[in-house]
Amino acid sequence: VEKEVIHLKKGFLMPYPVVHVLFFLFCIGAVAIYAITGPLSRRELSFRDARKLLLLAFVGGLCTLFPDIMVVYNIVINRTLEHCSVGSIPTHSLLFSSTAILFGGLVGYAAYREFSKAVHMAIFAESAFLTHLLLDDIAEGGCEYLYPLYSRPISVFSIMDTGFAEAGSLFHYLAASVVSVFCVFIVILMALFALNKFGFDFVYRKEK
């Protein structure tokens, strides 16, 4: 029993959930934070604006923790920190990310009663979920992204260590170099695309 309690305490001291939330809000959402600093300093944000920002932070912060959601059940019922699967389905997979899409869509529709905004909130929630997988990929060396099509862990970041000789050709070397960066690019682009629907107008302004 003492060993189980110590194991649980060690698990709770691990900062991973905090890191996942902060990474999404302050790294992926850095442009959005920059966009509101001006209106915030000029006190131009209304209560409605503040409520919208809090809703986005809530959806993003919660959905980035969805891959580890089973840890709550296992701590209470099984007294373990197991959190990587629901039955045979790995939670760190694109298949399980459908839970974030569904949650984001339902919250978006409940808040705005508009299908378009519900879709954009779902995309925003999905981008939050995917940042969790990318961080775990870096830390643990892979996730089961393609389950059930491919059940073994895949690491998009380990591909960066592929040398020219290992790649076998210039094309394969360039492709391996681009993959991990492209995955991060797509996740950031999804978040920015979704935020554009909620008042964050990211446009290029020509110099006068």
Predicted regions and their residues:
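N-terminal membrane-targeting hydrophobic helices
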Residues: 1-208
